[in-house]
Amino acid sequence: MRSTVAAFVAAALAGFTSACSTPGNYKVTFYGYPDNDPPGPAISGNCGRGNRAGGTGTYDDPVTIATAPGELNQCEIVYLPFLTKYGRVEDYCAQCDSDWKRGQPHIDIWTGSASRNGGQAQIDCENRLTPGGRYSIVRDPPKNYGVNGEFDPITAYRALSLLQIMLTWTGAAPLFSPPNTCNTGNVYPKNPAHC
């Protein structure tokens, strides 16, 4: 009887997908075209983008994340509360690998254009975006979390110009826009992670 119950429980649990979780203590850094290795948009994994970094941060178009092999699953989508964006593991990060081997989780997040090199201005922006401290992410997140830059009718209503309305409507909330726009206001280090 016990073996029948155990077999039933094991079979039932095998049908479940992974549950949402909020692992913490992640070191967070940023990278882009000028400091990628080699410089440019090439990434090590192909998760449907043709080996090119990118993403707006929605669930359907997550921003590229680099990390250590085995830290997260290749092509895994996570939610980044400190950015209010979804990210997908698509690239390798040498410093992340060194940190991971010492027990420190570390993710490196793509900041911008896949077609334009932002040069030193982009590297300076990445340094300003890096919040310091340690943060939680959401693994196996729901698809309906809020995303920085999605259309918000209240914000659009309050917008003072047509340009602001257009930016709100198109969901433009990049971290870096060449040649030198750094959007440090798109980082929310106090946002909690939750399932």
Describe each model-derived feature in a short phrase.
Residues 15-195:
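Secreted/periplasmic proteins
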Residues 1-19:
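Fungal secretory targeting signals
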